[in-house]
């Protein structure tokens, strides 16, 4: 459909449409889309070279490179970039864009900021992303995941109060989505992730009430039928969240509450 409409698109949109053809090279479904990730990243590099001042293109290009080696950008032992990854190119592209945005007063770009956080959170120097985290924080108040993203850096730098506060804001935003769409969707994974982060931050702060409130609210919005959904296999991602109240009781030494807790037979019970 995009290719059919390409003639009426802008020049940059036409190059993006052409690049997508490298991302999805067959009309038939395949088991592993990663086989085309390199082709797509190479195509997006060409788009970027022609449009390096377009921050939408910056975000799409960086994402394409990062998805070649997801969660394998830095060697956790040496702290060096993984040799087969595009880590340093991502760093150069994103830091150039961020410097330009800060220098010319352009509108902060959530995609650029979001990806920089993901790039730096597994690096040996996550603190380099603290300003970017603050720039993304509250930038799009109704986007729960983006309210949350700054805390990927906060938690690594010991800013646990911000972890609790920003994930509380994310949970508030997510409630709007939940009230409209319910729990039976993949976004419930992202909602649970925000509750989990709030719980984690509260445990580091020694704050029992926000910790237990977070886990109770999370469990209340993860019904058993969601966990048992087979396609997509939601239990693969969500079942572990159901055990987190036990973790909270142990962390705070609430042994009587732990002994009194009912055995969880199914999620939400």
Which ranges hold each PLM region?
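Oxidative protein folding and maturation machinery
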Residues: 245-249, 255-265, 269
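Solenoid-repeat scaffolds in large eukaryotic assemblies
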Residues: 58, 90, 114, 129, ...
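Short coil/linker segments at helix-helix boundaries
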Residues: 1-53, 60-104, 113-123, 132-135, ...
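Alpha-helix capping and inter-helical loop/turn segments
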Residues: 70, 124-127, 249-254
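Extended catalytic-interface subdomain
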Residues: 167-170, 188-222, 235-253
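TPR-repeat structural position
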Residues: 37, 87, 125-126, 160, ...
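Catalytic-core region of carbohydrate-active enzymes that cleave or remodel glycosidic bonds
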Residues: 152, 157-169
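Active-site-adjacent "gating/activation" loops or surface patches in catalytic cores
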Residues: 110
């Amino acid at each position: 459909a995009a290719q059919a409409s390409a003639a009426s698109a802008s020049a940059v949109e036409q190059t993006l449409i052409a690049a997508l053809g490298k991302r999805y090279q067959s009309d038939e479904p395949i088991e592993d889309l990663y086989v085309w990730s390199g082709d797509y990243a190479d195509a997006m590099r060409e788009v970027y070279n022609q449009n390096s001042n377009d921050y939408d293109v910056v975000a799409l290009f960086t994402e394409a490179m990062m998805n070649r080696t997801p969660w394998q950008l830095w060697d956790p032992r040496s702290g060096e970039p993984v040799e087969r990854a595009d880590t340093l190119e991502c760093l150069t592209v994103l830091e150039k864009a961020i410097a330009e945005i800060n220098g010319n007063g352009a509108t902060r770009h959530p995609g650029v900021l979001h990806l920089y956080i993901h790039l730096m959170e597994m690096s040996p120097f996550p603190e380099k992303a603290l300003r970017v985290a603050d720039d993304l924080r509250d930038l799009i108040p109704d986007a729960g995941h983006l309210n949350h993203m700054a805390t990927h850096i906060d938690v690594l730098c010991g800013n646990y109060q911000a972890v609790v506060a920003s994930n509380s804001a994310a949970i508030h935003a997510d409630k709007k989505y939940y009230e409209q769409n319910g729990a039976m969707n993949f976004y419930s994974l992202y909602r649970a992730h925000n509750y989990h982060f709030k719980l984690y931050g509260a445990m580091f702060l020694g704050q029992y009430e926000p910790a237990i409130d977070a886990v109770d609210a999370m469990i209340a919005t993860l019904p058993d039928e969601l966990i048992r959904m087979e396609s997509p296999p939601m239990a693969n991602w969500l079942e572990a969240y159901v055990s987190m109240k036990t973790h909270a009781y142990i962390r705070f030494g609430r042994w009587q509450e732990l002994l009194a807790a009912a055995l969880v037979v199914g999620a939400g019970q």
